[in-house]
Amino acid sequence: MVRGKIEIKKIENVTSRQVTFSKRRSGLFKKAHELSVLCDAQVAAIVFSQSGRLHEYSSSQMEKIIDRYGKFSNAFYVAERPQVERYLQELKMEIDRMVKKIDLLEVHHRKLLGQGLDSCSVTELQEIDTQIEKSLRIVRSRKAELYADQLKKLKEKERELLNERKRLLEEVNMHHSSKGNTEGGHRTKHSSEVETDLFIGLPVTRL
């Protein structure tokens, strides 16, 4: 029988939680022992239950393993600390540069809007004037492009309307021409019938 997948979440029932803790703890220590024996590794496992009770397993003396771990952690921290501090310092310098750049851009933007010009020198005002002229040229160029595009679309629409008008006029003329031919045929037939009626019978002899 296939067992369903157990959802990993806190077990609310206290009795079930204690039973599961006991089973999982035993399984954990068993796996730790197997790892130690099979791979000739130093293994230590420390578990505190919810009630605060200590449970532990070690392949050798727990104190020696913990002491070894402490020395390794301290050595790793000491070796990595200068690199971390240098990275943080570089990051701080980069942030300072970005803040200064943003401040300069904000000041320049205000000057382009005509604000804070009292402290500007003649050279700065000339640079601002040049920048404004450049911006105006860009705006005018873009405006001309939009107008040209709009004019092109209007001309295309005008051409479509003229073609449609021409087509409708041709249809109207064809309709009138066809109607006129039909009425002319009717009139010719009627005249023939009238003339036939007039000449039927013997000619009258005059005295």
UniProtKB/Swiss-Prot annotation:
Xref: CDD domains: MADS_MEF2_like
Cystines in this chain: none
Positions of the MADS-box domain: 1-61
Predominant cellular place of this UniProt entry's protein: nucleus
InterPro entries noted in UniProt: MADS-box/MEF2_TF (IPR050142), MEF2-like_N (IPR033896), TF_Kbox (IPR002487), TF_MADSbox (IPR002100), TF_MADSbox_sf (IPR036879)
GO MF entry, a single one: DNA-binding transcription factor activity
Presence of keyword Transcription regulation: yes
K-box domain ranges (all copies): 88-178
BP-aspect Gene Ontology terms: cell differentiation; flower development; positive regulation of transcription by RNA polymerase II; regulation of flower development
Swiss-Prot/TrEMBL keywords: Developmental protein, Differentiation, DNA-binding, Flowering, Nucleus, Transcription, Transcription regulation
Location of this chain's protein in the cell: Nucleus
GO cellular component: nucleus
4Fe-4S in keyword set: no
Disrupted gene: phenotype observed: No visible phenotype under normal growth conditions.
Record's function text: MADS-box transcription factor that acts with AGL42 and AGL72 in the control of flowering time. Promotes flowering at the shoot apical and axillary meristems. Seems to act through a gibberellin-dependent pathway. Interacts genetically with SOC1 and its expression is directly regulated by SOC1.
Entry protein name: MADS-box protein AGL71
Species in which this protein is naturally found: Arabidopsis thaliana (Mouse-ear cress)
